[in-house]
Amino acid sequence: MFVFIGCTRLAGSDYPMDTKFLTLSKREGRGSLEVTNAALNYGYSILEKFCWSALENAGLELYAGLLHVDRPGKPSLVLDFMEEYRAWVVDRNIIKLRARLGKETSLTPDLKTEIINGIDATMSAFITHRGKKVRLENIMQRQAYRLAGAMTDGKRYKSIRFKW
């Protein structure tokens, strides 16, 4: 998990250009006015809430990260945990909206609704995990418990792999 997440972080700046997003010339963080960046940021904020809830239910300290630097007010562990789900939950949904994003100049309420609905559908979707059909939201909760086990009992944490 740790090596994989570190590699994805380093590759993140090249990712959008490689997938030929219509409106994205470079990745920008919070406060971006460019529509694709704003859509990604909006989607990540929704994903953050799902991850926050799963980790909190598992009894983990949300501000004590493993990869992200601990900073006051930053839920570092939540940001670490999100890495496992970013591409599958958010990026896929934003890519599906690329035709709309190319026509918009800002993140409209209708576009926000589409992002919310897409992410909600993804989190509610049944995925085969360990031989069983399980909702992604439940898989996320199980992964949070596994992470708690890895942190407290020294067990090995194995991240989930999504098949495109």
Task: Locate predicted features.
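Active-site helix-to-loop segments that bind/position phosphate- or nucleotide-bearing substrates
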Residues: 1-164
